[in-house]
Design a protein with these regions (language model features):
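Soluble extramembrane regions of membrane proteins in the secretory/endomembrane system
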Residues: 78-81
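Charged, low-complexity helical/coil segments in non-catalytic cytosolic or luminal regions
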Residues: 17, 26, 30-49, 85-243
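N-terminal Sec-pathway targeting helices
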Residues: 5-20
Length: 243
């Protein structure tokens, strides 16, 4: 019977662990790519509607299924602020507040502590105004029913001594693309849930779903994660030499 040295066993363990890990990573990547491809096909095969209220109405009444509709999204009761109109507007009040923390340092084996003072802008109040309904291609929808309407920072205004106001909102009358599904006779999410609002044209929305470009972006992130975990596995195996 051939006996293996401890170092050879460690090498085999490392090689085996890395091989198994690579196989799992490849399988995960394959599943992820297939998921992206399904999403891309779902958007690509949907009915495209370009600023056509009649076609949009027809798609709902005939329950055609997936739709990508492009048009203007407008608030029923817009909120005005500094010359512009918004579907919803948020005002955050912040106070410049003093805080303290204990900082401990060790030099030449001697540990000392001191109190450090620092300041941050802390939220003390939040107000939100919103149009209850929005209009899109002559159809009314509850604003809360639409997903993807992400607020954007508008401006920061001084409120006096140690007070400031942050304003965020979603601008009214934007040209958007809504991804939805009309299989039930109403507009739902294209793959379930709520219809999604994109601030892009139909062609740009479909291009953003391209699985190859999305996978390329994700691969960079996954590669870093893979390397960190692989190095951790190797580190654990090598660390076992101490025992």
């Amino acid at each position: 019977m051939i006996k293996m040295s401890k170092s050879n066993k460690e090498r085999l363990l490392i090689v085996g662990a890395v091989i198994i890990y690579i196989l799992l990573a490849v399988i995960f990547r394959s599943f992820y790519y297939n998921s992206l491809l399904d999403d891309y096909k779902l958007y690509g095969q949907s009915l495209k509607i370009h600023n056509d209220p009649k076609k949009f109405d027809y798609a709902i009444k005939t329950k055609v299924g997936g739709v990508l509709a492009e048009g203007k999204l407008s608030a029923e009761t817009p909120i005005s602020f500094e010359g512009k109109k918004y579907i919803f507007l948020e005002k955050i009040t912040e106070r410049y507040t003093m805080h303290t923390r204990t900082v401990t340092t060790t030099v030449n084996g001697k540990t000392t502590s001191r109190t450090e003072v620092y300041y941050t802008w802390d939220e003390i109040d939040r107000e939100t105004k919103q149009s209850k309904k929005v209009s899109f291609l002559n159809k009314k929808f509850n604003t809360d029913y639409m997903a993807g309407m992400y607020e954007k920072h508008i401006c920061t205004r001084s409120g006096g001594y140690k007070i400031r106001y942050q304003y965020n909102g979603y601008e009214d009358n934007q040209n958007v693309t809504i991804a939805g599904n009309t299989r039930t006779g109403k507009v739902e999410g294209i793959d379930g849930g709520y219809p999604m609002v994109y601030e892009n044209s139909i062609s740009d929305v479909i291009a953003s779903k391209n699985p190859d470009s999305r996978l390329l972006l994700a691969t960079g992130v996954f590669t870093v994660i893979y390397l960190v975990i692989a190095l951790a596995i190797i580190g654990v195996i090598l660390d076992s030499r101490r025992f």
